[in-house]
Amino acid sequence: MEGPLELTGLSRRFGSLVALDDLSFTVARGRVTGFLGPNGAGKTTTMRAIFGLTQLDGGTVRWNGAAVAPADRRRFGYMPEERGLYPGMLVGDQVRYLGRLHGLSDHEATVAAVHWLERLDVADRLSSKVESLSHGNQQRVQLAAALVHDPELLVLDEPMAGLDPTGVDAIGEVLTEQARAGRCVLFSSHQLDLVEDLCEVVVIIDHGRVLVSGEVGELESGGAPRLSVRVEGDRDGTWARELSGVEVSEVKGGAVRLVLRPGVDSDVVLDAARRAGRVLEFAFARRRLSEVFREAVRG
């Protein structure tokens, strides 16, 4: 998959710790790309490398086919996991100031700051100090600061961490809008159901290496056959756990999700379900992103 942001062969060590190990992937325009991995997988180091905030031992970061230059980074927007707002500064002044740092005139920065604070439902806190805001509203202001200069690339490290559903929806809508407007959007999250809803593409890494990348739909349609089975009166899938070559991947709301190993016939599973009780549901199912993630990380 090609895109204007290309990371090729990135490597970085911190003493004996290998943070990035020949990591390569691209981020396309017009799509939201989810960047996934366990804690310590190398996601934050990768994002910092895009902005030149960590020195690489090897590899290249390219934008539109050329090495990223300082002028390019002025067209990038970054929301780091460790939030970078000044606690004692007024919200409006903070966002406007960051717009000026990215080359906007004072008037342009003021107009853009008001626009994004309104869009993210925090315009009423324009004259409040950042430190007086709730965690969720600080997240919204941080996103406004990343968007104030209308960036071509938006990189967000755990932007929805700790947010309530309203905050998640608000930020998710903005990311989708940015992608539809032709921007590149890359964001990391441990909330896999959220990534599944928002993203068309995912990159899964661990130990600084890419394990899996591609279209969410294609990844979910691959892998071993899966069944969703609901048996009247069954709450824990005990009947399925006794079947050879069948793995119970999830039990939720009375439905049992099963993974069939090679050579296992679904009719065998159906017969076992019928012996356990009245079968209310028996259907083939796609992999969920959470299953793709677990299988990739488990190896």
Residue ranges and their predicted role:
Residues 2-5, 12-206, 212:
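ABC transporter nucleotide-binding domains
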Residues 8, 230, 283-285:
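Solvent-exposed beta-strand sheet faces enriched in polar/charged residues
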Residues 72, 220-223, 293:
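Short, flexible helix/strand-to-coil boundary loops that buttress conserved ligand/catalytic motifs
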Residues 105, 123, 246-247, 279:
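Short coil/loop linkers at secondary-structure junctions
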Residues 170-260:
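ABC transporter nucleotide-binding domain
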Residues 261-299:
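C-terminal coupling/interaction segments
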